[in-house]
């Protein structure tokens, strides 16, 4: 197959940041993607509908005039989140989901939830009104090994929550383990999972072998090869419970290349080329559209995009920038460590 035309894709987990960084990165997403769920872990975080409305306005202001893009806003769940504010945000069409960050799990998550019981009133309201909960599925207790955080979260937090509120719709974001894949597959309704581009490509060796490579460090951290293969199998299967959420997370290089570097990989520039490569490798190009364009909208109760994009296989490797320059500073672009031959040749 030398070309493929699919419905315009969506990104169901994206970090756009704010200010100069927002202005520097948004076009890399909006050029190709029609919609994206926008993460709320700013400083300060997006905790109220008023915060979300103001942030949405800043995103739209930064959008290039020729781009058609819809930011889907989320709220950062805290132990003090107002159920009424959440419901009003949902009813107004402003809020697509609420995001659960266990305190300390990732970038700017120190204000997240420490005691799930204190968040139950808003979770109960969300279950009642049908508003999805997006979860960063890791525990942060110091006695749990970082590579086991996801599996322990499923057993100690997610499964008890779903048993208590079976009607709550939960997206397990950036699944990184076979444990997560198996748990989603075994669930009966109201559970789905997003998978990132980079977790389909790298395992933990990318971070550690041959020296510390900070631009492959993310949270959840990449796992063993058997987990990567389980993610690939899920992504290319066509199973409607799995869809793309890039978790593309820009940080300026000085904050990555230091003694205590930030977690996050910036994949927005070359995600579709990387994914076409992965699906071609797996003999599943015909299921790429389901993963990037169909399964996510179906899960979130939205219609798939009518616009199309075309990817073409080039004879010579496609050259992407090694880094982009933003007003906040340089940001390194994800290097999949293999040549990319697929290129988006016709945008929507």
From Swiss-Prot:
Q: Which HAMAP family match?
A: PyrC_classII
Under Enzyme Commission nomenclature, its number is 3.5.2.3
Quaternary organization? Homodimer.
Function description = Catalyzes the reversible cyclization of carbamoyl aspartate to dihydroorotate.
Q: Which family does it belong to?
A: Belongs to the metallo-dependent hydrolases superfamily. DHOase family. Class II DHOase subfamily.
Binding-site list for Zn(2+) 2:
99, 136, 174
Annotated keywords: Hydrolase, Metal-binding, Pyrimidine biosynthesis, Zinc
Quote one Gene Ontology molecular function term: dihydroorotase activity
- Where on this chain does Zn(2+) 1 bind? 13, 15, 99, 247
The cross-references to Gene3D superfamilies, in alphabetical order and at most eight, read: Metal-dependent hydrolases (3.20.20.140)
| Pfam families to which the protein is assigned, alphabetical | Amidohydro_1
Reactions catalysed, semicolon-separated, are: (S)-dihydroorotate + H2O = N-carbamoyl-L-aspartate + H(+)
Q: What is this protein called?
A: Dihydroorotase
Instruction: Spell out the NCBIfam families in the cross-references.
Output: pyrC_dimer
In this UniProt entry, the residues modified to N6-carboxylysine are: 99
Presence of the UniProt keyword Zinc in the record:
yes
